């Protein structure tokens, strides 16, 4: 990779304040872990996203698309690619009756509050999920009985041919923590949500109740990446881990949360290796004790 030439190309496209060389990924993940990315860019428009991908393809440079890094563990050696971060630079919202049209870089909590103020209900579940709309639609994020497929009408994506296509709810194939976007490697650009009219006080009350539940049961005050494991059929990952007496168990700076065993927290400048070793230890213990396989919900990326 000719980093310097690529850097200049991206600066010409979006300005140097949105392009970063040798950028520490710990600054861009909720785990606060990760070595440097060769190049990280933060596009502001659909066209900048499309051209960013085009620059990478023309130069045969690998690229990786991320949101705000709330479900990401970047390995300690970092990422040998261009990281395209679709986050706070790409966050416009439009209201059209009961429909909300949103760019995918907006945070779920920010959007949830805007939707509440517009007196629309159905999106309360998303308020405390620490991610962007793009990440949420890509993995069909959900919590407390709600998930994205309950509220999504359609989604504009960038496909591998550089075309922007509209996918209906059916075409999105949203399932437990997966979608056609994830399977095909598309880039989510704009989501249309279909909601219902509601009363502000009732919507706010639901959001406040869920906030209390989250803050008392989840270690949101510490660097983490949410639930580390997908829910195994018929079980709860956190309960299995707790029943292996692993609550509070540490490897290096990484610890099984003392508040919720389904979370791993960075308590003392943990490395990615610490977290990966802890994940492997948890999986081994749960498999040996219960004969249940735990599979990662957190996405692990970067140079091995």
UniProtKB/Swiss-Prot annotation:
Its EC number is: 1.3.1.98
Indicate yes or no for the key word S-adenosyl-L-methionine: no
Q: Which cofactor does it need?
A: FAD
The residues forming a coiled coil are none
Sorted alphabetically, the keyword list is: Cell cycle, Cell division, Cell shape, Cell wall biogenesis/degradation, Cytoplasm, FAD, Flavoprotein, NADP, Oxidoreductase, Peptidoglycan synthesis
Subcellular location(s) per record: Cytoplasm
By sequence similarity, the record places it as follows: Belongs to the MurB family.
Q: Please state what the protein is called.
A: UDP-N-acetylenolpyruvoylglucosamine reductase
Q: What is the lineage of its organism?
A: Bacteria, Bacillati, Bacillota, Clostridia, Peptostreptococcales
């Amino acid at each position: 990779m000719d980093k310097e030439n690529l850097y200049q190309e991206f600066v010409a496209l979006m300005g140097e304040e949105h392009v970063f060389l040798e950028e520490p990924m710990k600054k861009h993940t909720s785990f606060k872990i990760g070595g440097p990315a060769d190049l990280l860019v933060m596009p502001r428009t659909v066209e900048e996203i499309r051209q960013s991908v085009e620059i990478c393809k023309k130069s045969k440079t690998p690229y990786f698309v991320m949101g705000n890094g709330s479900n990401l563990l970047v390995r300690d050696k970092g990422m040998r690619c261009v990281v395209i971060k679709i986050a706070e630079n790409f966050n416009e919202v439009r209201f059209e009756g009961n429909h909300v049209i949103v760019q995918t870089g907006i945070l779920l909590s920010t959007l949830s509050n805007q939707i509440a103020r517009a007196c629309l209900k159905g999106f309360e579940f998303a308020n405390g999920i620490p991610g962007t709309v793009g990440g949420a639609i890509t993995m069909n994020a959900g919590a407390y009985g709600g998930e994205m497929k309950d509220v999504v009408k359609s989604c504009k994506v960038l496909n591998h041919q550089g075309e922007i296509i509209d996918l209906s709810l059916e075409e999105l194939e949203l399932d437990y923590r997966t979608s056609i976007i994830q399977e095909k490697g598309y880039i989510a650009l704009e989501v249309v949500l279909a909601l219902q009219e509601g009363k502000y006080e009732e919507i706010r009350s639901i959001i406040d109740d869920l906030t209390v539940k989250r803050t008392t049961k989840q270690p949101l005050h510490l660097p983490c990446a949410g639930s580390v494991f997908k829910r195994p059929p018929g079980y709860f990952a956190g309960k299995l881990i707790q029943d292996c007496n692993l609550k509070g168990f540490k490897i290096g700076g990484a610890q099984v949360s003392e508040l919720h065993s389904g979370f791993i927290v960075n308590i003392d400048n943990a490395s990615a290796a610490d977290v990966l070793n802890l994940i492997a230890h948890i999986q081994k213990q749960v498999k040996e004790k219960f004969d249940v396989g735990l599979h990662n919900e957190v996405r692990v990326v970067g140079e091995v």
